[in-house]
Design a protein with these regions (language model features):
Chain A
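Short beta-strand/helix segments in adaptor/scaffold domains that form protein-protein interfaces
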Residues: 1-118
Length: 118, 118, 118, 118
């Protein structure tokens, strides 16, 4: 019979998921341009690192993808969506380490657990 | 030696976490009053249920807590924060069922895995 | 010499702008599908109508545009952006009526004051 | 008979309002602490300055108010709300300059047009 209480590994993965959902839905829609990409990435990292059990957040806002998007239209900024960012999040929960990331996969920003270590 | 790949139970918990972070950071800050609480709760449920592996979302926006908050000031609406809502989320990932919830605990909106079942 | 204090008409237009920025940046990024479009539109209207001097908000989430977007990919939901919604906002500030709207124009969700009446 | 079309001054005020609503509802709810306040303020300024006709945005996240809030509880971060920030926005629309600001007034974050100049 499997236990219905979460293990520490499972709770650590739950915590990793919270950070991804928070980061994405807090900042999606933010006006962004090649010139403001760095300050946004820095703020996203520092904001989510405030959350419990969050060891490190690495956000890469791809200025080249922003430039490509803007080359086709009259505007000089767009809205942040998953297609412009890679994210890596590192959780430390009770000695369990979780690395999860977000990457564009077949046109969608997929969030996955990369590894769980004790 | 423990495996570093996530189990299905761990991935199911990760998915539950994503939904909580998404729900909270998408809707926190929304102008809300006793009269608009129901429509907001309904929209929050339907929005997050769109996400993958999300079986059901139950959002309770407490009109009594809104009324109490508003009784002390001149405004007739406030901004949505965790102190006004209870949330239950039910995940079904590859036959693993996760129930997680958000409840106010000592003044903070804590998100926890309630149970994991196969 | 022009006065530097805002007139009531100008303040009414400022209030209209606040409502548009609020609506757009609160709800952009929300997971949405043809099935959840109605509940989201209703919640957006009720939420923003809470704000001061806001007489009426009319949000039309275009289910046909959502269906067209989703026809091309593997997912059955997307994120709310301006290309899926028309918005009309009606302000009443000190007897000044402002009607403003958001419409897709050459690929961009433009927000404009339609009319100001006393 | 007053004209129902907006004047340039009125449109400039509408644009100022859009920026305030955008800034507030994009960033309200962001996890923030004294240590992350500066990076968040910088990102808010750069993000909103991307928007059309937006000359300058000045955001002051009050670290002292954050420290005071956090002194009473067990957490070392909170969520961004109006009570922690002052905002000044400067619009230049067709030669019309609008300065608007957000300040806490009797417990509420009020947004006002400070001056309109040609």
């Amino acid at each position: 019979m499997s236990d219905t209480r979460p293990t520490d590994r499972e709770t650590a993965c739950f915590e990793a998921g919270i950070k991804f959902g928070s980061l994405y839905h807090q900042f999606a829609g933010t006006p962004v341009s090649p010139g403001s990409a760095d300050s946004l990435a820095t703020a996203m990292e520092a904001a989510i690192e405030n959350q419990p059990h969050c060891d490190e957040v690495v956000v890469d806002v791809h200025e080249d993808r922003l430039r490509e998007e803007l080359a086709d239209g009259p505007a000089d900024y767009t809205e942040l969506t998953g297609k412009f960012v890679d994210v890596d999040i590192y959780i430390d929960y009770e000695g369990i380490f979780v690395h999860a990331h977000m990457r564009m996969t077949e046109g969608y920003p997929l969030m996955d657990v990369v590894e769980v270590r004790e």
